[in-house]
């Protein structure tokens, strides 16, 4: 009985940890994470007032927003640190269209308490697949042995919205809004946005912009833009309940073909099913 209870506890912790990892990979790429769980829906709040920025700077950033949005996809390399809870690296390609986010990332845990939890199950990295309606995470063999041999955990966004406490709802909204040009949209609402200057970023001439967004839960957003009005680099800094949040992302190969296949149904466990089994 004790062994069964311990197994259930581990499974529950991992299901939550994997959700946190999926959030962390993209946490800095849009305004959604800055909302509290109890706040009104994000899109209404963002459209209730006009952008704070006007003039030549606004025109320049809107050109970046349009160009990045039209590109539709890019290769991504990112590092994320969330206080003492989690640090990770992610590499892959993501696409953004009207129907949402798609793509595949390889996520490597590099530190923090969440990483320690995953390492205890023999998992130091995972594959994450983002589809318009769901997020999938591939675990290792040791975890699969605990859940009937299935390696993939499935998180349907609509189901996440029903989670208690509001955390799932924030994740679902974030996944639908996660694109590089969301950072530009955020800067267009910043009152202190400024052009820092011209810099070389990964061997390319770029223009550096910086500003503070998010109101009471302010984050600093910095972007570096090339001569095609495409983001080359983005850095976001702020605070979370677990400490300082810092994410650095690099973008390249805009327009790259992106695909993400659904894992085999027989090798996939729905997160709701896994959580429900904890009370059985």
Residues covered by each model-derived region:
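A short, amphipathic edge element
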Residues: 185-194
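N-terminal beta-strand/beta-hairpin edge segment
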Residues: 89-137
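Extracytoplasmic
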Residues: 69-73, 98-100, 123, 130, ...
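Gly/Pro-enriched, hydrophobic low-complexity segments
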Residues: 198, 204-266
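Acidic/charged, solvent-exposed loop-and-adjacent secondary-structure segments enriched in E/D, K/R, S/T
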Residues: 132, 136-178
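Short, hydrophobic/aromatic-rich segments at coil-to-beta transitions
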Residues: 70-77, 99-104, 115, 202-210, ...
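Beta-turn initiation residues at beta-strand->coil junctions
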Residues: 78-80, 106-109, 139-141, 235-240
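N-terminal leader/targeting segments and the immediate start of mature chains
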Residues: 2-102, 272-280
